[in-house]
């Protein structure tokens, strides 16, 4: 059976690969969006990092950073390093016992979850937004082939 640890390692690898690939596209891609009112590419890329920091906060208590908006390749590559660091923290969290975590949500209420749930959500969350990102880029004439970053590709490159 695949473990959450392997899924986290795949997530971290694919995050790095996708940040690299985006950095090779034209600078203007950061303002592309699926439709009026939807998030542009730059905001989605920021959301990968912000969300990773949120999951890290839930598990470790480390406060969130004041991250710059991703509007160009230079900032994207800085944030690639940041998400790489946070992804390593999430991978390390897998080795700890699953336990209940209590946190205050955006609604001001106390919520309960578990370490396994937070780690699983981190994995699923990135997958969801990678699909969104790929669709925006394809609709705008750019190609982000997510099959290049699937679990089989990860396995073949990390044996």
Language-model features: locations:
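Short, contiguous alpha-helical
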Residues: 5-20, 24-69, 107-159
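Helix-adjacent hinge/juxtasegments
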Residues: 61-97
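Acidic catalytic patch
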Residues: 94-108
């Amino acid at each position: 059976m695949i473990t959450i640890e392997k899924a986290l390692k795949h997530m971290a690898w694919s995050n790095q690969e996708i940040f690299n690939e985006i950095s090779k596209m034209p600078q203007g891609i950061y303002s592309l969006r699926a439709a009026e009112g939807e998030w542009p590419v730059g905001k989605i890329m920021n959301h990968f990092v912000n969300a990773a920091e949120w999951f890290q906060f839930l598990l470790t208590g480390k406060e969130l950073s004041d991250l710059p908006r991703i509007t160009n390749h230079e900032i994207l590559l800085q944030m690639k390093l940041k998400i790489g660091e946070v992804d390593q923290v999430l991978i390390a969290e897998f080795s700890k016992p699953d336990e209940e975590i209590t946190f205050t949500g955006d609604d001001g209420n106390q919520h309960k979850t578990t370490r396994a749930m937070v780690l699983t959500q981190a994995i699923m969350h990135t997958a969801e937004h990678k699909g969104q990102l790929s669709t925006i880029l394809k609709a705008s004439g750019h190609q982000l082939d997510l099959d290049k970053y699937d679990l089989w590709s990860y396995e073949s490159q990390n044996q």
